[in-house]
């Protein structure tokens, strides 16, 4: 094989490697965005009133997670 043929094959190999690397980064970014959206939704679902916040603060709990059966639900961490 001539030197020109080897150079062309090498160039094609490098181009294919570079494009596959870029595609992988795009997939990772999409997955990362999907995870961030899930986290944001779980945080914004809870409905908190000032009365609930004060109730939890008086009982040495950190966070009001919302109402459960009409009663304030307090916890250190809120899930969902």
Swiss-Prot record:
Q: Major location, coarse class?
A: secreted
Cellular component terms per the entry's GO annotation? extracellular region
What are the disulphide bonds in this sequence?
Answer: 52-65, 56-74, 64-78
Record-listed Phenylalanine amide modification sites: 79
- The entry's propeptide annotation covers 21-44
- Tissue-wise expression: Expressed by the venom duct.
* Short name of any one Pfam family annotated for the protein: Conotoxin
Query: What is the annotated signal peptide range for this record?
Result: 1-20
Which GO terms label this protein's molecular function in UniProt? Answer: ion channel inhibitor activity; toxin activity
Secreted: is it a keyword of this entry?
yes
Matching InterPro entries: Conotoxin
Q: Would you identify the family this protein belongs to, as annotated?
A: Belongs to the conotoxin O3 superfamily.
What name has this protein been given in UniProt?
Answer: Conotoxin VnMSGL-0121
Q: Which organism is it from?
A: Conus ventricosus
The organism's taxonomic lineage, starting at the top: Eukaryota, Metazoa, Spiralia, Lophotrochozoa, Mollusca
